[in-house]
Amino acid sequence: MTRLQILLGAILALFAVSIAAQQSDGLTRQDGKPVQITVYAPPAGDICLGIAIISPGAGGSESGYAYLGQALSSLRYFTVVVGHQESGLQALRQQIQGHSLREGLARLITDPQAYEGRFMDIAAARHWAAQRCNAGEAILLGHSMGAATTMIEAGAKNKLGLSVPDAFDVYIALSPQGSGLIFPVGAWQGISKPLLSITGTKDDELGGGSWETRREPFENMTPGCKWFAVIEGATHMNLAGHGMSRRSQALTTQTIQQFLLALHQGECKPPAPQRGIQILAK
């Protein structure tokens, strides 16, 4: 069984969990549609340092990525995990009708309307969170399709005709995509804000490419607080917080904390080498 088959099987196995975990809050985006969110607030009494918005992968929901929500809230960021109805579980199910899961995912992650919905969801969540923590910086973090969303928000060119204002101060992309279905070669040269990319040595791409394709955005970006981290043995679903992922989760959240600390210190220097993870910086 290939890694891609394992990945696709894991996504199917998570469908029932996603359904059970969904919950609704009272957010409404600019077109009047509801936005489901899960909130992770900083510990009571702590001063909020800023806000963090988390954008799930295709088929994901606001009930996932708890390890990231908990980690960022512990760092005193008012954190919101956003559900995306145009690219959530139900949307993915519709895309795979009459197609394989792999084909359905490819159709969904290249659907411009799905991204437009994501941008509205994120804008609504950002506005709502800023009313509760009107201080510090704004972070956008995304995984998989959420990473593509994050890169486009940060200023990456794309093949889908999408454009959105660069509204965040810091960007974090887990499992970013290289050039292909979504991004042309050289798409990331215009990204100027601090950006952290994280992948794993078992984080294969949907098309079957190895994790090494995920390094392309980092290599293409201009220098200026850009990090690229590779976690030994981490899979695509580990970075989403599933599977035997405790070690991968710990290294992911540790790297995010180190990146934010280095950014605040003004030099953005990477940490000392550590077993199990490699970090490149420029």
What are the language-model segments listed below?
Residues 24-134:
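Serine-hydrolase catalytic machinery in alpha/beta-hydrolase-like enzymes
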Residues 1-8:
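Bacterial N-terminal signal peptides that target proteins for export
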Residues 109-113, 182-183, 239-249:
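Active-site rim elements
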Residues 16-18:
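N-terminal signal peptide c-region/cleavage motif recognized by signal peptidases
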Residues 233-234, 240-282:
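Alpha/beta-hydrolase-fold serine-hydrolase catalytic core, especially in secreted/extracellular enzymes
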Residues 123-190:
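Primarily recognizes the serine-hydrolase "nucleophile elbow" in alpha/beta-hydrolase
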Residues 59, 84-88, 178, 203-204, ...:
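Alpha/beta-hydrolase active-site loop signature
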Residues 163-233:
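The feature captures the conserved acid-bearing segment of alpha/beta-hydrolase catalytic domains
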